[in-house]
């Protein structure tokens, strides 16, 4: 049984931890609002980019001038998985959820006889995936020093992916991230980047259905510029979704930790009071017994 001094020290230690988790919860809550606004603002732009890309792509489908980023290599053997996670932990199962989703995809592809390569964005994803797939990780990117995610960060990743594709290092590229739904809900998501999604997969706006477009210069030339930018835009959106999801998960995790610390403090305090009461009672009995002996 721990002594009164040990219990007192443990209570003080848990109270100090509770102060830290409560402060971290408040910081995460403040960051969450800004991150959520940024993620929600990026969604319409990225979705519209996909729609525009699909509409232009219709004009060059099966044409000789279609960009290779849209048509692909014609093969489906080598897959590059770009797995985006957070740089830090203390956010519940946020990182492990994305990594587990990507890991299941890797196992499925390997079972089908495909060659898999992994590009990790974020330290935690790398730390988790290297335990099982160290030999498959061909590229890693950490954003630990980046205070605020900007488009230039996503653009660097996008350009590196395109460089790898043009060098013939893979046939298909899929982006993995966590889509922010709410503080308690972040959904692991997979999005194919290369080849660009088939035009029919993105519906044209109902108001413009059947409209005839004229492109200047030709559609293929526009796609040559648009597809690389769209890849960076989709990565940027994924990074923003991840930040919002991370802050939501962190706020929830720190709230749980704060409440658990409170429960532990109550239990330790109760144990301390009982032991102290028993000790006082014992001392009183000893005093009374001594007095009677006299």
Swiss-Prot record:
Key words, A-Z: ATP synthesis, Cell inner membrane, Cell membrane, CF(1), Hydrogen ion transport, Ion transport, Membrane, Transport
Highest taxon in the source lineage: Bacteria
UniProt GO cellular component terms: plasma membrane; proton-transporting ATP synthase complex
Alphabetized InterPro entries for the sequence: ATP_synth_F1_ATPase_gsu, ATP_synth_F1_gsu, ATP_synth_F1_gsu_CS
Membrane topology recorded in Swiss-Prot or TrEMBL: Peripheral membrane protein
Gene Ontology molecular function: any one: ATP binding
Main location: membrane
Localization terms from the record: Cell inner membrane
One annotated GO biological process: proton motive force-driven plasma membrane ATP synthesis
Record carries keyword Oxidoreductase: no
NCBIfam families according to UniProt: ATPsyn_F1gamma (TIGR01146), PRK05621.1-4 (NF004146)
The family this protein is said to belong to: Belongs to the ATPase gamma chain family.
Record-linked HAMAP family: ATP_synth_gamma_bact
Subunit-level organization: F-type ATPases have 2 components, CF(1) - the catalytic core - and CF(0) - the membrane proton channel. CF(1) has five subunits: alpha(3), beta(3), gamma(1), delta(1), epsilon(1). CF(0) has three main subunits: a, b and c.
Entry function: Produces ATP from ADP in the presence of a proton gradient across the membrane. The gamma chain is believed to be important in regulating ATPase activity and the flow of protons through the CF(0) complex.
UniProt-recorded name of the protein: ATP synthase gamma chain
Protein's organism: Rhizobium etli (strain CIAT 652)
């Amino acid at each position: 049984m721990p002594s009164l001094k040990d219990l007192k020290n443990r209570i003080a230690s848990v109270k100090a931890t509770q102060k830290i988790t409560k402060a971290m919860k408040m910081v995460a809550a403040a960051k969450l609002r800004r991150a959520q606004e940024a993620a929600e603002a990026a969604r319409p732009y990225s979705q519209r980019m996909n729609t525009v890309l699909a509409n232009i792509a219709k004009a060059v489908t099966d044409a000789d001038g279609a960009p290779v980023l849209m048509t692909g290599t014609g093969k489906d053997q080598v897959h590059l998985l770009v797995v985006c996670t957070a740089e830090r932990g203390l956010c519940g199962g946020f990182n492990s959820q994305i990594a587990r989703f990507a890991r299941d995809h890797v196992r499925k592809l390997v079972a089908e006889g495909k060659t898999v390569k992994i590009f990790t964005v974020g330290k935690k994803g790398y730390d988790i995936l290297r335990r099982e797939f160290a030999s498959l990780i061909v590229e890693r990117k950490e954003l630990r020093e980046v205070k605020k995610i900007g488009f230039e960060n996503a653009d660097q990743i996008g350009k590196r992916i395109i460089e790898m594709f043009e060098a013939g290092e893979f046939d298909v590229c899929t982006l993995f991230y966590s889509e922010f739904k709410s503080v308690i809900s972040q959904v692991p998501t997979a999005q194919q980047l290369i080849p660009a999604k088939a035009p029919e997969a993105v519906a044209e706006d109902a108001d413009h259905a059947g409209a005839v477009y004229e492109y200047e210069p030709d559609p293929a030339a526009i796609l040559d510029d648009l597809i690389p930018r769209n890849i960076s835009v989709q990565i940027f959106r994924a990074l923003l979704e991840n930040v919002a999801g991370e802050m939501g998960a962190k706020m929830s995790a720190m709230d749980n930790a704060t409440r658990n610390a409170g429960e532990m403090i109550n239990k330790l305090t109760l144990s301390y009071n009982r032991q102290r009461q028993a000790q006082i009672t014992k001392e009183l009995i000893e005093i009374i017994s001594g007095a009677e002996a006299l």
